[in-house]
Amino acid sequence: MKKLLCAVLLSPLLYSNAVLADDAKQLRETLNGTESLKADFKQTVTDINKKVIQTGAGVFALAHPNQFYWHLTAPDESQIVADGKDLWIYNPFAEEVVIMDFAEAINASPIALLVHRDDATWSQYSVTKKQDCYEIKPKSTDAGITSVNVCFNNGTLNKFNVLDDKGNLSQFDLSNQHSISAADKSLFKFVLPENVDVDDQRLKTQ
């Protein structure tokens, strides 16, 4: 009787974990089917009271393995480039470039998770499917990002949003989606501008 009771009590938990695992697998399979993508985006940021505090626009691109490009062109320019090994963050206004190991890319830009195929990295997140969208949440309680939602239309990424721990919601709507061309591959090669300060935070190997 006790064994039966335990089985009844535990079965919802086991089912829930199985569903979450299936959702994560399905998301990764969908992402794996997108070898590359380039799109324009429009950004809207709202605060915890749903007041619009910023709007913007730019160009977004990704390619497997571990290549990522993010160029905010308005209102203030900024650029994030992952070349598969290193992550470059460029702030033209501050004339500064920060360089990180790609392993740290997700902390700087959680959307980089979309090109991450590393099992250990994905194991740090839970995934829940909601219709055509997937909610990705870090398991760490001290993460600066509360959740990332990615949405697809017929298998094509068409929007995503990022909720931070202060309640700010950044929403991105994509348009003009297409696979990257041979010429677009240069997007993932960051060219260091002249006369900028460089903050190299990469872990130095012995």
From Swiss-Prot:
Cellular component per GO, a single term: outer membrane-bounded periplasmic space
This protein's record includes keyword Protein transport: yes
GO biological process, one term: lipoprotein localization to outer membrane
Domain of life: Bacteria
Cell compartments where the protein resides: Periplasm
Keywords (A to Z) from UniProt: Chaperone, Periplasm, Protein transport, Signal, Transport
InterPro entries recorded: LolA/LolB/LppX (IPR029046), OM_lipoprot_carrier_LolA-like (IPR004564), OM_lipoprot_carrier_LolA_Pbac (IPR018323)
Function in brief: Participates in the translocation of lipoproteins from the inner membrane to the outer membrane. Only forms a complex with a lipoprotein if the residue after the N-terminal Cys is not an aspartate (The Asp acts as a targeting signal to indicate that the lipoprotein should stay in the inner membrane).
Family: Belongs to the LolA family.
Stored PANTHER family: OUTER-MEMBRANE LIPOPROTEIN CARRIER PROTEIN
Complex and partners: Monomer.
Protein known as: Outer-membrane lipoprotein carrier protein
Organism (species): Shewanella sp. (strain MR-7)
Organism classification: Bacteria, Pseudomonadati, Pseudomonadota, Gammaproteobacteria, Alteromonadales
